[in-house]
């Protein structure tokens, strides 16, 4: 993924070589629109060109596009569920339920889409040049529904139904539709995107209209990218996946497979917690645990003692104030009696 400084260098080099038109076409920027924003950009020097190009927001848009196009594309071959997220972030998709089909791109896409939807929307809003309020946006089984279609020949399809629960649901749907569709043009993994925005009326609120984005993403490519790894490495990764997914002696298999009726009770994060990871002797391990508990008790005792001292100090101050008020009251009574 190109960083912002690298994109600035690309813009500067295009100005040096006077190949600005080719640069704009390669990056899907309309020369006429750029000319309306940056007047006579063909005749500006390199420093003015870079400054005006950045001021117009094009470098920010190109940086956001780079972040979106890297979405779910880079795969760690040691762990195929460790994928590239939005921008520089790496996301581990292995937490949660174990599914033998997770190595497929549509499973990874759905898992990463659900995990990073807010980051995707914020990046897409910068790419579009509009700010979207994501503060009150919440995701549950009603607002975000995803499914993987059955595998047909070489077509792999994922369906996403997104129903924002905020006032600006239309702008969110339009931003997500336009910018993800734009980003998919630059990705190696996506062949087709079909999307539509459906207006729907909320129940018992006939005067308000909310919007739903119904998007179908089709994938047409092999398990790993051809230009990144050899065929032998592909086979090795595939064998490791098959081995870890289908061996019955793998504890993750029986705990997270769909055949286990109690699989929903378990989570991979807290699977088999290790109480004594350093393998200390039992006596030493218990002694360390007792010392740790003693330190915790001492800390609580000091805290409670301080609270008692503060309470006693507050009580003394209250008693002193009562005495002063009593003396003042007696003086006022004496003065009143003297007047009578």
Swiss-Prot record:
<dbReference type="InterPro" id="IPR055659">
    <property type="entry name" value="DUF7235"/>
</dbReference>
<dbReference type="Pfam" id="PF23882">
    <property type="entry name" value="DUF7235"/>
</dbReference>
<protein>
    <recommendedName>
        <fullName>Uncharacterized 39.7 kDa protein in nrdC-mobD intergenic region</fullName>
    </recommendedName>
</protein>
């Amino acid at each position: 993924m190109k960083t912002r400084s690298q994109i600035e260098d690309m813009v500067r080099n295009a100005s040096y070589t006077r190949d600005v038109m080719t640069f704009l076409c390669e990056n899907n920027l309309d020369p006429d629109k750029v000319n309306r924003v940056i007047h006579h950009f063909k005749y500006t020097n390199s420093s003015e060109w870079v400054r005006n190009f950045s001021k117009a927001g094009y470098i920010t848009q190109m940086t956001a596009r780079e972040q979106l196009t890297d979405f779910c594309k880079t795969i760690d071959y040691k762990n195929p569920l460790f994928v590239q997220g939005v921008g520089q972030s790496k996301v581990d998709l292995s937490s949660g339920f174990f599914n033998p089909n997770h190595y497929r791109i549509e499973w990874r896409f759905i898992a990463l889409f659900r995990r990073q939807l807010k980051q995707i929307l914020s990046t897409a809003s910068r790419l579009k040049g509009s700010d979207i309020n994501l503060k009150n946006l919440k995701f549950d089984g009603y607002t975000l529904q995803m499914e993987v279609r059955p595998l047909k020949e070489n077509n792999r399809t994922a369906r996403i139904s997104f129903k924002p629960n905020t006032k600006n649901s239309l702008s969110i749907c339009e931003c997500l539709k336009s910018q993800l569709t734009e980003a998919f043009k630059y990705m190696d993994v996506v062949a087709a995107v079909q999307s539509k925005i459906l207006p729907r009326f909320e129940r018992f609120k006939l005067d308000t209209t909310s919007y739903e984005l119904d998007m179908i993403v089709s994938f047409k490519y092999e398990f790993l990218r051809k230009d990144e790894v050899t065929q032998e490495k592909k086979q090795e990764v595939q064998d490791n996946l098959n081995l870890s997914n289908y061996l019955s002696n793998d504890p993750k298999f029986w705990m997270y497979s769909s055949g286990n009726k109690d699989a929903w009770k378990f989570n991979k994060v807290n699977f088999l917690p290790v109480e004594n990871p350093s393998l200390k002797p039992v006596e030493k391990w218990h002694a360390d645990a007792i010392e740790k508990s003693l330190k915790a008790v001492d800390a609580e005792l000091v805290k409670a003692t301080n609270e008692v001292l503060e309470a006693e100090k507050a009580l003394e101050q209250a008693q002193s104030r009562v005495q002063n008020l009593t003396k003042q009251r007696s003086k006022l009574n004496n003065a009143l009696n003297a007047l009578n």
